[in-house]
């Protein structure tokens, strides 16, 4: 009997692992539209964490920074250097807040999926996860980046900005137009795919071996999440710099 039960229990366990689902959503009906409620909830948590941290960090600024203020100034310096490197010495200033906000939102969103126990909170449908685990979030961030670099180019060059589409030769017009469509696609799918894959791998490993084994993968996921935030922010700054200078 035990010999028969063993394969059956193994099959049941495999069936439970196969229950790890993708694309299950908790919908809110707003007007005539359905929105992903769990994405809004987790995004609000991330925004609250960022606003709360910023408020605490700057509530009592000192002339000689110490502790938390010193750490915040180090982060701001990092954003400034990143933006200046990609956009250029003369134009980078106004774009530091945008690039910094992009990096922080993506970074905290990615880490929230690994560090916060979203699974404790049960929803009627779907489950809570990192905001960047949803393709709608990453597409929105990518489209916001596209709007930013079009705005930067038009502000700097006016209608002459569109002359880049026929450079260095008008034959490349279709390819240059296609490039502007592939930029947001690559930004959104790269971020979404990496975060989703990381959470699925951890979920499967926890189902197979609940102790010890998933821990190194979780640490690797934290590292990957930080790298993805850096890649997104760097590319966003590079696209903005390219739209203003025409050479990157």
Swiss-Prot record:
Disulfide bonds: none annotated. Its main location: plastid. It comes from the Eukaryota. The chain crosses the membrane at residues 38-58, 96-116, 135-155, 200-220, 221-241. PROSITE patterns: ATPASE_A (PS00449). Keywords: ATP synthesis, CF(0), Chloroplast, Hydrogen ion transport, Ion transport, Membrane, Plastid, Thylakoid, Transmembrane, Transmembrane helix, Transport. GO terms for molecular function: proton-transporting ATP synthase activity, rotational mechanism. Pfam families: ATP-synt_A (PF00119). It is found in: Plastid, Chloroplast thylakoid membrane. CDD domains: ATP-synt_Fo_a_6. It is a multi-pass membrane protein. One of its GO terms (cellular component) is plasma membrane. Key component of the proton channel; it plays a direct role in the translocation of protons across the membrane. F-type ATPases have 2 components, CF(1) - the catalytic core - and CF(0) - the membrane proton channel. CF(1) has five subunits: alpha(3), beta(3), gamma(1), delta(1), epsilon(1). CF(0) has four main subunits: a, b, b' and c. Belongs to the ATPase A chain family. HAMAP family: ATP_synth_a_bact (MF_01393). This is ATP synthase subunit a, chloroplastic.
């Amino acid at each position: 009997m035990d010999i028969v039960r063993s394969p059956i229990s193994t099959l049941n366990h495999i069936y439970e692992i196969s229950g790890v689902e993708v694309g299950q959503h908790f919908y809110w009906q707003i007007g005539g539209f359905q929105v992903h409620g769990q994405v809004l909830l987790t995004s609000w948590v991330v925004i609250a964490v960022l606003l709360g941290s910023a408020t605490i960090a700057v509530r009592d600024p000192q002339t000689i920074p110490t502790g938390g203020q010193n750490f915040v100034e180090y982060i701001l310096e990092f954003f400034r250097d990143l933006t200046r490197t990609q956009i250029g010495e003369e134009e980078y200033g106004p774009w530091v807040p945008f690039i910094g906000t992009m990096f922080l939102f993506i970074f905290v969103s990615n880490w929230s999926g690994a560090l916060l126990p979203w699974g404790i909170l049960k929803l009627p449908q779907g489950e809570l996860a990192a905001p960047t685990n949803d393709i709608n979030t990453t597409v929105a961030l990518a489209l916001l980046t596209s709007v930013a670099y079009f705005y930067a180019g038009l502000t700097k060059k006016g209608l002459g900005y569109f002359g880049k589409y026929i450079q260095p030769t008008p034959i490349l017009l279709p390819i240059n137009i296609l490039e502007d469509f592939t930029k947001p696609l690559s930004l959104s799918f790269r971020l979404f795919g990496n975060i989703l894959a990381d959470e699925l791998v951890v979920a499967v490993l926890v189902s197979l071996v609940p102790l010890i084994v998933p821990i190194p993968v979780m640490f690797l996921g934290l590292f990957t999440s930080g790298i993805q935030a850096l890649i997104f922010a760097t590319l966003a700054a590079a696209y903005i710099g390219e739209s203003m200078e025409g050479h990157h």
